[in-house]
């Protein structure tokens, strides 16, 4: 990992995600698929939103071919751009279970919620990585049952009133383990 990155993990709480017990027998063949997609360009308008990882089209496009999908790595990354030094932007993030009632406007009231100043003369212009605590949030995004505690990212961002260009981009990246191909018709 490069020293130009800032790693900002959320503190952990003592909790365990729900999951079904594994079936006995030899495990099925599996593949690990890396992904990365852009969520938002921040710094032009105030933003208060959330992202359900299990519902993202970039992920469902390839998990649709399998019966089971489990996240093995998940991170939110804030990428400052050339406008960041002149137009500092505040970005607040928090990973929560999907069924959490926490809102983007109250991220700092969520245990582990963090706010970053992106840009400015003395603040961060390095990418900021916020890993999802997959030991506390259910990493199973596709299974024989539907889980309501899969990862959700809360996002809140302010914007300088004088900025006309985005100052940073928010991306999600990670790896998902896929197994048990979904049997379907091969004719269309």
Swiss-Prot record:
Provide the family line.
Belongs to the tymoviruses capsid protein family.
Q: Which GO terms describe its molecular function?
A: structural molecule activity
Q: Which UniProt keywords apply?
A: Capsid protein, T=3 icosahedral capsid protein, Virion
Q: Which SUPFAM superfamilies match?
A: Positive stranded ssRNA viruses
List localization entries. Virion
The name of this protein is Capsid protein
Give a short account of what the protein does: Self-assembles to form a T=3 icosahedral capsid composed of 180 copies of the capsid protein. The capsid encapsulates the single-stranded RNA genome.
InterPro entries noted in UniProt: Tymo_coat, Viral_coat
Upper classification of the source organism reads:
Viruses, Riboviria, Orthornavirae, Kitrinoviricota, Alsuviricetes
CC annotations in GO: T=3 icosahedral viral capsid
Question: Does the UniProt entry include the keyword Ubl conjugation?
Answer: no
Q: Name one Pfam family in it.
A: Tymo_coat
């Amino acid at each position: 990992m490069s020293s130009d990155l800032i790693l900002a993990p959320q503190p952990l709480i003592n909790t365990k995600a729900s999951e079904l017990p594994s079936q006995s027998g030899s495990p099925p063949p599996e593949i690990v698929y890396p992904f990365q997609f852009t969520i938002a360009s921040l710094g032009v308008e105030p933003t208060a939103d959330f992202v359900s990882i299990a519902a993202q089209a970039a992920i469902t496009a390839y998990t649709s071919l399998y019966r089971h999908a489990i996240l093995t790595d998940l991170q939110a990354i804030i990428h400052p751009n050339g406008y960041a030094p002149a137009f500092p932007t505040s970005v607040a993030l928090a990973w929560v279970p999907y069924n959490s009632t926490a809102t983007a406007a109250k991220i700092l009231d969520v245990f582990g919620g963090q706010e970053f100043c992106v840009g400015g003369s003395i603040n961060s212009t390095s990418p900021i990585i916020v890993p999802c605590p997959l030991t506390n949030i259910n990493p199973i995004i596709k299974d024989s049952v539907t889980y309501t505690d899969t990862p959700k990212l809360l996002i809140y961002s302010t914007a300088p009133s004088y900025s006309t260009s985005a100052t940073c981009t928010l991306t999600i990246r990670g790896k998902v383990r896929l197994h048990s191909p979904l049997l379907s018709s091969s004719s269309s």
